[in-house]
Structures are given as structure tokens and as C-alpha cells.
Amino acid sequence: MHSLPRSGSIRRTHSDTQATGWPPPQRIGDSPGPSPAFLSCPPSLCGGAAQTGDPVALPHGPEKWVWGGGLSPRNPHSWGIKAHGLRPPWAPRLERCMVPESEWAPWQPQLPCEPKWLGSRKSKPHRESGLRGGGPSRCAKRGTHSCGPRESGGPDTCHLPCH
């Protein structure tokens, strides 16, 4: 009787992950499935997360990395960033349940400039979001058009992002 409600709750988590697009559906029947399913992540982390009482955190966390990073080992093309980012995220993945920001912040900087990203953050994201300009080619435009007026405020800010 006790195992019934238990497997019901577990099944719910699985069906939830299934909806999210969790690749291996065969593991739904397995109770110990999640552990082998996330072999990519250290057993200590996997076990710790499960014991924490956040079963959803396990499937939802890895699901993201398995989707984006899990393909990297097979696709050498993604190895550059995805595979690299697959390692650090395992730690943030657990925090991600509490702080969603910690999930994207840690692996974002690992791209080209890890330490600089914090400082360049103001210029990089602005460039991509197009808050200051209007598109990806805007960087070149900023170099000529915005550089003039922007120089009075801060020439560094104008030259750094463009070059």
C-alpha cells in the first residue's frame, strides 16, 4: 500500500520529464532508472540531489544539460562549448533549483572570456540584445556612429565592444 502512492509520485515526475522531452523514455518503468540515466553526472551529486527530496530537480536539471550537452560527446561540433560546459554545470545544476540565475551565469562566462565576462557583461549582452544599437552588425555601426557621441561619456566603452 505504501509503495503505491510512492510509485505514483515517482511516475508523476517521470511523466513530467517525458513532457519536457526527456530522451530515454525506457527508463520510465525503472525505479532506479534515474541513477543510470544520469551516469554523466557524478553519482554523489545524483544521489545527493535525490536524497535532498527534490526528485524534479534531478530530471529537470540534467535534462537541460543532457539535451544540450549530452549531444556534444556525439557531435564533435558542439564539443567546443557544450561539452566544456557540461562539466561545471553539474554543480550549478543543484543550486539551479534555488537560484535559476546560477544556472546560466556559471556556464555563460566559460565561453571566450571567463573572468572578463563579469566586466564586459555590460558591453557584450548589450551588443547581443541590441539594446544600444539594433542588430548584430550594429557593432560596426557603433564604432563609427555611436563612438562620436559616446566618447564624451566614455571612449573605452565604445571602443572595447567594437574591437
UniProtKB/Swiss-Prot annotation:
Domain of life where this protein originates: Eukaryota
Region (Disordered) residue spans: 1-78, 115-163
Remarks, miscellaneous: This protein has no orthologs in other species and appears to be the product of a protein-coding gene which has arisen since divergence from chimp.
Name of the protein: Uncharacterized protein DNAH10OS
Lineage, broadest ranks: Eukaryota, Metazoa, Chordata, Craniata, Vertebrata
Gene coding for it: DNAH10OS
